[in-house]
Amino acid sequence: LTCNTCAFKTCANSETCAAGKNICYQRKWNEHHGERIERKCVANCPELGSHDTSLLCCRIPDCN
């Protein structure tokens, strides 16, 4: 599985997930400088945090 790994709205960077990490993850939240985005491979989909504006977990290549 490959997942996007950049912190921007459009993403050209992806990585091959390590063994056991078969979920692509994207989390968004707001900071003083605007919206922040985190993307990576994970083993389990995390809970939506109190400051998160959205959370996406998926198993299709580069779906995050």
Curated annotation (Swiss-Prot):
It comes from Micrurus frontalis. Expressed by the venom gland. The keyword Disulfide bond applies. This is Frontoxin V. Its main location: secreted. GO terms for molecular function: acetylcholine receptor inhibitor activity; ion channel regulator activity; toxin activity. Coiled coil: none annotated. It comes from the Eukaryota.
